C-alpha cells in the first residue's frame, strides 16, 4: 500500500495562535514528524526555546536528526501526560508561553503495516504509539473480558454493535488467538450487520482499541489538568483534536477553567474569588476546504485555543 506523506494539519493557524513571544519557551507535546516544531522554531528568536515530547521512538529519531544542531530545541521520549514532571525537571513550571497538542495518530503510524494500527493492510496487532511500554492490542484483545471489550468499543468507538462484536471476538480467540490486524478486522467485519457507506466496518472498533491501548483519553485529561500550572500568565494552550471524544474533553476543560469554581447560587462572591484560570480565544477552528482537499485526514480536525489568566 502506498504511504501518504505526513501532512501537518492546521499548521500555520496553530503556530500563529501559539507563539505570542519569540523569546519565550514553548512545548510541542506531540512532535510526530516535526511539522509544527519546525514552524515554531522559525518563529522563535535565538533566546526562544522549544521542548518537544513524543511517545514514538521513530518520532524521537526524526527529531534528533532534524534538529540536532539547533540549541533552542530539546526532545523527550515520554507521554505528554508527564508534562508537569518534564517541565519541573527543567525549571519551567509557570514559565511556559505556549503548549501545543496535536492529538491522534500520524500518517506514518497509520500507513506502516508493522505498527499494527491499520485494518486496511495486514500487520502485527500492536497499535502502541510507544512500543517500549504497555500491553499491545493483541495482548489486550486476547485477555480482556467480553464486557470490557464491549464497553471499550461502545465508549471509545461509539460502535452500536459493540456487544455483538465483543461476543464474536471472544468466540474467535478461543479457537485462534489474535496476532494480526487482518484477522481482527475480518472478525469485526463479519459481526457488523450494517456498514456505513464509505467507511470500513472495522473503523470504529479499531479506533476504540487504539484509544484503549494508548490510554489516549486518560492522558489527555492528565495533560489538560497540568497545563494550567505549567503555563505562564498569558501563555496559550492550543489543542487539535480529531474525533468528538477528544474535542468534548477539551471543550469541557476550557469551559470549566473559564467558569471557575462552582459556588452555591446567590453566594456573594467577587469575580476574582471564583478562581477562573483561563479564557477561550475565539471559536473552534476547522481545516479549510482547500486543506481538506489537499489532505483528507484534516477533515475531522478541530482546533481550540485558550489563554491562561
Swiss-Prot record:
<dbReference type="GO" id="GO:0070475">
    <property type="term" value="P:rRNA base methylation"/>
</dbReference>
<keyword id="KW-0489">Methyltransferase</keyword>
<protein>
    <recommendedName>
        <fullName>Ribosomal RNA small subunit methyltransferase H</fullName>
        <ecNumber>2.1.1.199</ecNumber>
    </recommendedName>
</protein>
<dbReference type="InterPro" id="IPR029063">
    <property type="entry name" value="SAM-dependent_MTases_sf"/>
</dbReference>
<dbReference type="GO" id="GO:0005737">
    <property type="term" value="C:cytoplasm"/>
</dbReference>
<keyword id="KW-0963">Cytoplasm</keyword>
<feature type="binding site">
    <location>
        <position position="102"/>
    </location>
    <ligand>
        <name>S-adenosyl-L-methionine</name>
    </ligand>
</feature>
<keyword id="KW-0808">Transferase</keyword>
<feature type="binding site">
    <location>
        <begin position="34"/>
        <end position="36"/>
    </location>
    <ligand>
        <name>S-adenosyl-L-methionine</name>
    </ligand>
</feature>
<keyword id="KW-0949">S-adenosyl-L-methionine</keyword>
<comment type="function">
    <text>Specifically methylates the N4 position of cytidine in position 1402 (C1402) of 16S rRNA.</text>
</comment>
<comment type="similarity">
    <text>Belongs to the methyltransferase superfamily. RsmH family.</text>
</comment>
<feature type="binding site">
    <location>
        <position position="54"/>
    </location>
    <ligand>
        <name>S-adenosyl-L-methionine</name>
    </ligand>
</feature>
<feature type="binding site">
    <location>
        <position position="109"/>
    </location>
    <ligand>
        <name>S-adenosyl-L-methionine</name>
    </ligand>
</feature>
<dbReference type="GO" id="GO:0071424">
    <property type="term" value="F:rRNA (cytosine-N4-)-methyltransferase activity"/>
</dbReference>
<dbReference type="InterPro" id="IPR002903">
    <property type="entry name" value="RsmH"/>
</dbReference>
<keyword id="KW-0698">rRNA processing</keyword>
<dbReference type="Pfam" id="PF01795">
    <property type="entry name" value="Methyltransf_5"/>
</dbReference>
<feature type="binding site">
    <location>
        <position position="80"/>
    </location>
    <ligand>
        <name>S-adenosyl-L-methionine</name>
    </ligand>
</feature>
<dbReference type="InterPro" id="IPR023397">
    <property type="entry name" value="SAM-dep_MeTrfase_MraW_recog"/>
</dbReference>
Amino acid at each position: 500500500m502506498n504511504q501518504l506523506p505526513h501532512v501537518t494539519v492546521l499548521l500555520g493557524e496553530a503556530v500563529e495562535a501559539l507563539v505570542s513571544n519569540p523569546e519565550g519557551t514553548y512545548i510541542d507535546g506531540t512532535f510526530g514528524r516535526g511539522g509544527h516544531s519546525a514552524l515554531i522554531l522559525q518563529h522563535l528568536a535565538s533566546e526562544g526555546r522549544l521542548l518537544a515530547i513524543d511517545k514514538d521512538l521513530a518520532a524521537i529519531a526524526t527529531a534528533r536528526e532534524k534538529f540536532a544542531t539547533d540549541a533552542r530545541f530539546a526532545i523527550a521520549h515520554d507521554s505528554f501526560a508527564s508534562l508537569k514532571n518534564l517541565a519541573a525537571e527543567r525549571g519551567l513550571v509557570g514559565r511556559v508561553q505556549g503548549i501545543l497538542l496535536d492529538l491522534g495518530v500520524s500518517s506514518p503510524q497509520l500507513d506502516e503495516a508493522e505498527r499494527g494500527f491499520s485494518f486496511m493492510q495486514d500487520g502485527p496487532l500492536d497499535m502502541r504509539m510507544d512500543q517500549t511500554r504497555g500491553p499491545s492490542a493483541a495482548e489486550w484483545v486476547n485477555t480482556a473480558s467480553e464486557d470490557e471489550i464491549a464497553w471499550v468499543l461502545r465508549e471509545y468507538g461509539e460502535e452500536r454493535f459493540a456487544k455483538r462484536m465483543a461476543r464474536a471476538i471472544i468466540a474467535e480467540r478461543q479457537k485462534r488467538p489474535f496476532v494480526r490486524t487482518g484477522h481482527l478486522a475480518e472478525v469485526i467485519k463479519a459481526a457488523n450487520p450494517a456498514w456505513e457507506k464509505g467507511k470500513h466496518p472495522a473503523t470504529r472498533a479499531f479506533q476504540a482499541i487504539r484509544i484503549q491501548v494508548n490510554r489516549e483519553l486518560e492522558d489527555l485529561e492528565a495533560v489538560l489538568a497540568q497545563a494550567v500550572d505549567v503555563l505562564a500568565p498569558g501563555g496559550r494552550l492550543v489543542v487539535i483534536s480529531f474525533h468528538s471524544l477528544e474535542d468534548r474533553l477539551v471543550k469541557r476543560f476550557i469551559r470549566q477553567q473559564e467558569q471557575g469554581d462552582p459556588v452555591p447560587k446567590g453566594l456573594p462572591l467577587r469575580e476574582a474569588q471564583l478562581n477562573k484560570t483561563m479564557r477561550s480565544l475565539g471559536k473552534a477552528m476547522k481545516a479549510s476546504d482547500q486543506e481538506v482537499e489537499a489532505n483528507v485526514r484534516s477533515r475531522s480536525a478541530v482546533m481550540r485555543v485558550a489563554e491562561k489568566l
